């Protein structure tokens, strides 16, 4: 349905209600008093300068003795496919969304609030295809553990993007956008995941893979959370929202990711690099790393891969330079930190930026998080007999050696941060730890790695002077 067709359908309903008012011999003032509103609202609706909400349509129809069901059917046929992308209660984009057989899910943009464009998602391409891609990226990924169990609880399939959106409204703990029918009257304050309790039952399904029957309605961050491991968001009374994340399973060398999260954040702390704090907990008999949500209702996280047109390390470094020294230095420090701990999974989806939701401004680098595939988490006991040799077999996702990355980004600040790691020892958890011999071997390797990285000369300051402005 085009915007013109949508407007015509709305006008048809309003005209019928206006005609019914005139047949009753009621003035706009009299009708307004009957339904408990202002005459100005009736006037604007009949002039077409104010949209007719569902609640107001029902009240007017009942006051005029019109069949509400007929009105609802007519309204439903025009509105059931029309959605709005909102930031809080502000509409940014209005579009239709429908399944079209072999064509799959199709969107048609009806209206763009261009005056609010600085508030739009940074990764939203304002085309019909771009809207569909944005929605598909927003829902639970197909490779997430227990994805089928999570969606089965709600009577949905992994390919049903529209159905998932209809259930979860696109609500997320990454930002404050949501996607609802265009005539939806609800307020963000009553539905957002930051301030309202979400489905504990669905969190258990997400973490354990075991759950019950479909709930009538379930707002849940599980339907918009990325990543492949078992995980769940939990609201801890008087404390906040936490992410519980398990480890890999199915082989002798799996399951160590929660330990790596716990120990790696100690290294970041020692180096003085902003990072998310992790703890360990056995929840439902399964070891999990536990961290507090680092976004809030006013601040969103934007993965760098959602911003860059070309996802390469060079493009990323160039972009961070345009943001200023604080951003660039944090990125360089993260890359040196990753080289130190042999992080094998620093992809373009698990680091990025913090954004002010009200202004659209990028305000800070996001804290470092998601370090589970580091500190030799997959190493077998035999690998620890010669950990230095095993370390040389580790690699990052960039297809560039850790050492070559460090040669590019090493600066005086990173050198100072590395010096703090001399003679570093982990703080043991009170009850949940890797075997002591494994921890001791990792500490020894960290000492050797620190000295290796400190031997890399600082070339960055001279090199940057010769680089052209971007």
Regions found by a protein language model. Name each.
Residues 55-70:
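DNA major-groove recognition helix of helix-turn-helix/homeodomain DNA-binding modules
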Residues 347-348, 352:
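Canonical protein kinase catalytic loop motif
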Residues 23, 49-52, 343:
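Helix-turn-helix/winged-helix DNA-binding modules
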Residues 1-23:
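A short, Lys/Arg-rich alpha-helix, primarily the initiator
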Residues 33-51:
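Recognition helix of helix-turn-helix/homeodomain-like DNA-binding domains
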């Amino acid at each position: 349905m085009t915007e013109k067709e949508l407007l015509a359908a709305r006008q048809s309903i309003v005209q019928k209600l206006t005609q019914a008012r005139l047949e009753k011999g009621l003035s706009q003032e009299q009708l307004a008093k009957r339904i408990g509103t202002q005459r100005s609202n009736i006037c604007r609706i009949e002039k077409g300068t104010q949209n007719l909400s569902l609640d107001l349509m029902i009240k007017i129809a009942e006051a005029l003795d019109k069949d509400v069901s007929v009105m609802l059917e007519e309204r439903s046929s025009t509105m059931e496919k029309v959605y709005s992308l909102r930031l809080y209660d502000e509409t940014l984009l209005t579009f239709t969304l429908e399944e079209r057989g072999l064509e799959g899910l199709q969107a048609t943009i009806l209206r763009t609030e261009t005056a609010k464009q600085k508030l739009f998602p940074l990764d939203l391409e304002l085309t019909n295809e771009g809207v569909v891609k944005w929605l598909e990226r927003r829902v639970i990924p197909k490779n997430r553990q227990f994805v089928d169990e999570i969606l089965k609880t709600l009577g949905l399939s992994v390919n049903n993007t529209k159905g998932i959106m209809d259930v979860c409204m696109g609500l997320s703990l990454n930002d404050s956008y949501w996607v609802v029918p265009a005539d939806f009257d609800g307020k963000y304050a009553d539905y957002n995941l930051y301030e309202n309790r979400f489905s504990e039952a669905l969190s258990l399904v997400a973490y354990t893979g075991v759950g019950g029957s479909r709930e009538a309605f379930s707002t849940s961050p599980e339907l918009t959370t990325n990543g492949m491991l078992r995980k769940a968001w939990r609201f801890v009374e008087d404390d906040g929202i936490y992410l519980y994340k398990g480890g890999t399973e199915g082989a002798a060398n799996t399951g160590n990711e929660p330990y790596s999260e716990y120990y790696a954040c100690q290294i970041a702390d020692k180096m003085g690099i902003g990072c998310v704090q992790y703890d360990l907990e056995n929840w439902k008999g399964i070891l999990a790393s536990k961290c507090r949500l680092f976004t809030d209702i006013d601040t969103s996280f934007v993965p760098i891969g959602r911003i860059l047109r070309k996802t390469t390390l060079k493009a990323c470094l160039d972009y961070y330079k345009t943001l200023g020294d604080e951003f660039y230095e944090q990125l360089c420090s993260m890359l040196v930190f990753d080289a130190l701990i042999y992080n094998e999974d620093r992809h373009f989806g698990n680091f990025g930026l913090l954004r002010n939701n009200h202004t659209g401004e990028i305000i800070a680098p996001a804290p470092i998080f998601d370090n589970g595939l580091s500190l030799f988490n997959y190493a077998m006991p035999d690998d620890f007999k010669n950990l230095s040799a095993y370390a040389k077999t580790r690699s990052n996702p960039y297809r560039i050696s850790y050492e070559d990355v460090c040669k590019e980004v090493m600066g005086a600040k990173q050198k100072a941060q590395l010096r703090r790691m001399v003679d570093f020892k982990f703080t043991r958890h009170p009850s949940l730890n890797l075997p002591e011999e494994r921890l001791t071997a990792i500490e020894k390797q960290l000492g050797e790695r620190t000295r290796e990285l400190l031997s890399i000369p600082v070339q960055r300051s001279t090199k940057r002077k010769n680089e052209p402005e971007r």
